[in-house]
């Protein structure tokens, strides 16, 4: 841990409800009537971002986003069981909507101008905070403290975009999944 590695964390998000292709056209998302006719709503969630979306020791998906998704299913279709969860990674959220693999994303997705050009967002369901996690013996209290250190980020996140755009001299170590990023932080 003393190697100067830190990790970013982002808490927050909005519901993604439809997508647009690269030309800006709305993709063929299922309509509410089609979802009701099918009897299931397909929702994308994280599998490794406790407490939001994660797989427990019994192999069951859990978390706040999962709870919220079950409530959506109950309100729309009559039962919390009328939901099919699909695991997504940060970088795959838009693609899963565009390809109709899911109807909705509940996976801590911050609204940005770039993302808003590709998908439609509902109102946010939690507040967002960007932070840095660091070892006790190498505390990061200010972005200046990151100079000369490696910063772990998850691909496709607001943290990756923020540091790439605003601090290009900070070396980013990028991972696909939150668990991989966490393990890398622990491994130093």
Question: What is each model feature region?
Answer:
Residues 56-60, 100, 119-122, 147, ...:
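Short, glycine/charged-enriched secondary-structure capping and boundary segments
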Residues 26-106:
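Extracytoplasmic small-molecule ligand-binding "clamshell" domains
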Residues 19, 35-38, 55-58, 64, ...:
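Surface-exposed loop/turn and secondary-structure junction residues enriched for glycine/proline
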Residues 1-38:
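Short, low-complexity disordered leader/linker segments with a strong preference
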């Amino acid at each position: 841990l003393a190697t100067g590695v830190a990790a970013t964390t982002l808490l927050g998000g909005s519901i993604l409800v439809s997508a647009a292709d690269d030309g800006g056209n709305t993709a063929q998302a299922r309509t509410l009537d089609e979802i009701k006719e099918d009897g299931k709503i397909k929702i994308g969630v994280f599998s490794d971002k406790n407490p939001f979306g994660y797989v427990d020791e019994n192999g069951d998906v859990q978390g706040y986003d999962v709870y919220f998704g079950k409530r959506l299913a109950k309100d729309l279709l009559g039962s919390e069981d009328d939901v099919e969860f699909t695991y997504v990674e940060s970088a795959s959220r838009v693609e899963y909507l565009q390809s109709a693999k899911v109807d909705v994303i509940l996976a801590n997705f911050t609204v940005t101008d770039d993302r808003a050009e590709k998908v439609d967002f509902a109102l946010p369901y939690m507040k967002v905070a960007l932070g840095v996690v660091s070892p006790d013996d190498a505390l990061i209290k200010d972005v200046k403290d990151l100079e000369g250190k490696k910063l772990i980020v998850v691909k496709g996140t607001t943290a990756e975009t923020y540091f790439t755009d605003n601090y290009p001299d900070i070396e980013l170590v990028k991972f696909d999944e939150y668990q991989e990023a966490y393990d890398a932080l622990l491994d130093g």
